[in-house]
Structure formats: C-alpha cells, structure tokens
Amino acid sequence: MSSSHKSWNSIYEFTVKDINGVDVSLEKYRGHVCLIVNVACKUGATDKNYRQLQEMHTRLVGKGLRILAFPCNQFGGQEPWAEAEIKKFVTEKYGVQFDMFSKIKVNGSDADDLYKFLKSRQHGTLTNNIKWNFSKFLVDRQGQPVKRYSPTTAPYDIEGDIMELLEKK
C-alpha cells in the first residue's frame, strides 16, 4: 500500500483485520453502501449506538447496507478490552451480526490508513481528527466516502442518507 493518502482512490484499496485477526480486503464491500464507525464498549453512547446499528443491519443488509465497526481505545480509554472480549460483549449484549474489526487508532501519526483516507475525503468541523467514539462515515457503492457524522449523531438520524444511497444502483 502506498504511504501517501493522495494515491488512495476508494476504500476497496485497503485490507484490515477482522475481530478474529483475519485479513479482510475491503474489496468484498464493492457495490454495497457502507457505514464505517469507530466503536467502544464502555462509552455512554455504546448502548444506543449498538442497538440502533444492529437494528439497521437487520433491516437493511438485504438492501445492500454493510456496517463496519472498528473498536478504538483513543477516547477516554473506553475500549480497554482485547478483541475476544469485545466480540463476546457485543454478541451477547446486542446480538451484533454486522462486521467487527480489530482495534485500531483513528487519530495521530499511527492512525490506521483507512481512517487517514476517510478523514482526507470527509473533513471534520474545526479539526480533521475524529472527535470521539461513534463517529460515522457513509460510503457509497463506489467506495467513496460521501458524508461524515459526529459522534452525537445517532444511527437512526442518518437513515435518510443511507436510504438515498441504497436506492441508487
């Protein structure tokens, strides 16, 4: 992979590790609308976000929505667990069936390249840094980040934008 984010053209160029440590090429999401979210299990927003994300997954996976969740411990140490514990928690408490990935960093020089790309394409307010857990990026069927949402924006609040992209074939 190139070290310059200017050469990245879509999310399909990235390979990430899933929650079990297995390499996953994001090419597998080609043709789908993706919602990419940095998550944490011990955040005040955990319950609302995981419940809404899972419910949306259940309803919209058949229409082409894919939710990609990336645990991150950069905000208040609210994702301290190892991947096996994270997986157990979200599966048992929320019945999570959407795709969970290994813990990453989303800010700083050692941020995951996928997040460097997302932030370069959809800038934040005041700063490009991810501000907290449950920041969201909406990616179209061509692998292009088209919208960025703040951590306080609930999944249900962006459903209209998701539906608009799902209706575009």
UniProtKB/Swiss-Prot annotation:
EC id: 1.11.1.9
Induction summary: Activity increases significantly as worms mature in their host and is positively correlated to the resistance to antioxidants.
GO biological process: response to oxidative stress
UniProt keywords, alphabetically: Oxidoreductase, Peroxidase, Selenocysteine
Keyword check for Cytoplasm: no
Gene3D superfamilies cross-referenced by the UniProt entry: Glutaredoxin (3.40.30.10)
InterPro entries associated with the record: Glutathione_peroxidase, GPX_AS, GPX_CS, Thioredoxin-like_sf
Catalytic activity: 2 glutathione + H2O2 = glutathione disulfide + 2 H2O
Molecular-function GO terms, alphabetical: glutathione peroxidase activity
Active site residues according to the UniProt entry: U43
Family note: Belongs to the glutathione peroxidase family.
Name assigned to this protein: Glutathione peroxidase
Organism of this sequence: Schistosoma mansoni (Blood fluke)
Lineage: Eukaryota, Metazoa, Spiralia, Lophotrochozoa, Platyhelminthes
